[in-house]
């Protein structure tokens, strides 16, 4: 059996509210997270909501990293989905912690695309 990708979901509670509403800061965090996990960045797009909140995605050659923030709740939801064996999604976590400074982080690990290569190639 082969795993085509790895997907971690991050539930980040008790984050710094100012960081959660900082669009340039969120964009920089995404770029730093891409570098930290060894992925190849294609592009980054962020959007600032009114009155608050930021959504962003880093499109990777290996998949994506996304974030959605709720500053009023001190909460952020993130996805780090990678394909290939050289990218380690968990390596993004220190960069994310450093910027958002969450009190609590829950990591949900999902193995994506479990296939029997020999069966597929037959």
Swiss-Prot record:
Assembly, per entry: Heterotetramer of two alpha and two beta chains arranged as a dimer of alpha/beta heterodimers.
Residues modified to Pyruvic acid (Ser): 63
Protein name: S-adenosylmethionine decarboxylase proenzyme
Entry cofactors: pyruvate
Organism expressing this protein natively: Methanococcus vannielii (strain ATCC 35089 / DSM 1224 / JCM 13029 / OCM 148 / SB)
Pathway(s) the chain acts in: Amine and polyamine biosynthesis; S-adenosylmethioninamine biosynthesis; S-adenosylmethioninamine from S-adenosyl-L-methionine: step 1/1
Site residues (Cleavage (non-hydrolytic)), renumbered to this chain: 62-63
Cellular component terms (Gene Ontology): cytosol
Top-level EC class: lyase
Cysteine disulfide partners in this protein: none
Gene that this sequence comes from: speH
Cofactor binding comment, as recorded: Binds 1 pyruvoyl group covalently per subunit.
Molecular function GO terms recorded: adenosylmethionine decarboxylase activity
Family: Belongs to the prokaryotic AdoMetDC family. Type 1 subfamily.
EC numbers on record: 4.1.1.50
Record's comment on post-translational modification: Is synthesized initially as an inactive proenzyme. Formation of the active enzyme involves a self-maturation process in which the active site pyruvoyl group is generated from an internal serine residue via an autocatalytic post-translational modification. Two non-identical subunits are generated from the proenzyme in this reaction, and the pyruvate is formed at the N-terminus of the alpha chain, which is derived from the carboxyl end of the proenzyme.
Catalytic activity field: S-adenosyl-L-methionine + H(+) = S-adenosyl 3-(methylsulfanyl)propylamine + CO2
InterPro entries hit by this protein: AdoMetDC_C, AdoMetDC_fam_prok, AdoMetDC_N, S-AdoMet_deCO2ase_core, S-AdoMet_deCOase_pro-enz
HAMAP family: AdoMetDC_1
Domain of life: Archaea
S-adenosyl-L-methionine is among the record's keywords: yes
Coiled-coil regions listed in the entry: none
Gene3D superfamilies for the chain: 3.30.160.750, S-adenosylmethionine decarboxylase domain (3.30.360.110)
Pfam families on file: AdoMet_dc
Function description: Catalyzes the decarboxylation of S-adenosylmethionine to S-adenosylmethioninamine (dcAdoMet), the propylamine donor required for the synthesis of the polyamines spermine and spermidine from the diamine putrescine.
């Amino acid at each position: 059996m082969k795993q085509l990708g790895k997907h971690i979901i991050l539930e980040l509670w008790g984050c710094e509210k100012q960081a959660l509403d900082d669009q340039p800061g969120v964009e920089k965090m995404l770029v730093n997270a891409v570098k930290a996990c060894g992925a190849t960045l294609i592009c980054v797009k962020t959007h600032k909501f009114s009155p608050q909140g930021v959504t962003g995605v880093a499109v990777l050659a290996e998949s994506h990293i996304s974030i959605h923030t709720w500053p009023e709740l001190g909460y952020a939801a993130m996805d780090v989905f990678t394909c290939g064996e050289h990218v380690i999604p968990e390596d993004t976590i220190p960069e994310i912690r450093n910027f958002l400074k969450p009190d609590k982080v829950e990591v949900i690990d999902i193995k994506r695309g479990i296939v029997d290569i020999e069966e597929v190639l037959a």
